[in-house]
């Protein structure tokens, strides 16, 4: 397999360590997503990229982006993945700034299905946020970008690696005291907060300072005057400082907040509205492959502290 098997490459965003393109497989005519990584620019991160590829091979859930193949061309690693045609939840937030509780509940329901599967397999995501939750035009929601995901060993209940994105990190991850799958639950709660308010807690503060605040302060909470009791309780169940006190994905999937609204067609409706909005706004077309790859190393450097909804 080589890059010539793909045509019509259009830059659609930035992923872990590199650029992400929409492309068409010449043989199957299938539209795919290509993550292209400049190995010269990421020599110290190749091990993590290899981990991502091996991790994705084993996954089999409708709510997790599918992995197809990978190959090296020159100094670039190409990873072929499922293309999600609805955009990320971060993209969809551009339409209205926030999601209604009905939409949030449906997103959470589907992400929780992915987490029930992952955690049941002894695996975790470790970087859940709106930018890593992708959608399809039919309303399907999928977890993506497992660049920092890891597999929990059967006889080991914690991990000391410092991974994730600062604003969404659980206290125990920041403190590096060891963590397990409950770190995903914290990130899920922060993501629910992000979808409801348009940005994660501490968004106006420099990421390095946030790393000091997360373990020091009480868990974030939603304003009860603005949100339903059920939603506030759902988020509260996710954002317990002690991981042992946090709910499991299985428990949260049956929470009254989820049962109140789900299942529903709200995600499909938002995706359709977003597509119409993009068309009416005449947003710039995706950037062709040839005009972007020449400075891919610079592109990677420029997005080091780009955390999506965080405003500067």
Swiss-Prot record:
GO molecular function, one term: ATP binding
Subcellular location(s) of the protein: Cytoplasm; Nucleus
Gene Ontology cellular-component terms listed: cell division site; cytoplasm; cytosol; division septum; nucleus
Domain of life: Eukaryota
Coiled-coil region: none
Keywords: ATP-binding, Cytoplasm, Kinase, Nucleotide-binding, Nucleus, Serine/threonine-protein kinase, Transferase
Name used for this protein in its record: Serine/threonine-protein kinase ppk11
Gene designation per UniProt: ppk11
